[in-house]
């Protein structure tokens, strides 16, 4: 698939100053396999609860970061067997971090159903960079 410069018809995920083309990431995984990502059959989900709470915030409390999803879609149209996509984030200082760039609806459903694990792909730094879209394009 050839992407337009603006990724207008691509599925993308944006978080603060970063944006990724999910279509590109999936294409790289299909084409390059382990050069693009490492498959993990059971990734722990409980650490994501802080970003995707199962219940609304208590009155008087504010969440600084919250991933917004369509709850009805998450519970009725997601397939939990499809691996989520996780991208490494290299900070200016300190250890690398990671972020879910595709699969937040699946994470929500899994957590609502009491599951603690889902399969995931961890992109390599190469695939993360190839999938990243400059935020000023969109």
Q: What does each model-identified segment do?
A:
Residues 35-99, 111:
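Short alpha-helix boundary/capping and kink motifs at helix termini
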């Amino acid at each position: 698939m050839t992407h337009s410069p603006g990724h207008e018809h691509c599925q993308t995920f944006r978080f603060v100053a970063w944006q990724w083309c999910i279509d590109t990431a999936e294409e790289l995984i299909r084409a390059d396999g382990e050069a693009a990502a490492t498959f993990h059959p059971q990734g722990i989900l409980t650490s994501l609860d802080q970003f995707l709470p199962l219940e609304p915030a208590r009155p008087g409390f504010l969440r600084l970061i919250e991933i917004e999803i369509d709850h009805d879609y998450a519970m009725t149209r997601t397939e939990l067997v499809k691996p989520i996509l996780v991208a490494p984030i290299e900070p200016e200082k300190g250890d690398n971090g990671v972020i879910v760039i595709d699969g937040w609806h699946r994470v929500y459903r899994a957590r609502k159903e009491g599951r603690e694990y889902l399969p995931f792909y961890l992109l390599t730094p190469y695939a993360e960079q190839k999938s990243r879209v400059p935020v000023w394009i969109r």
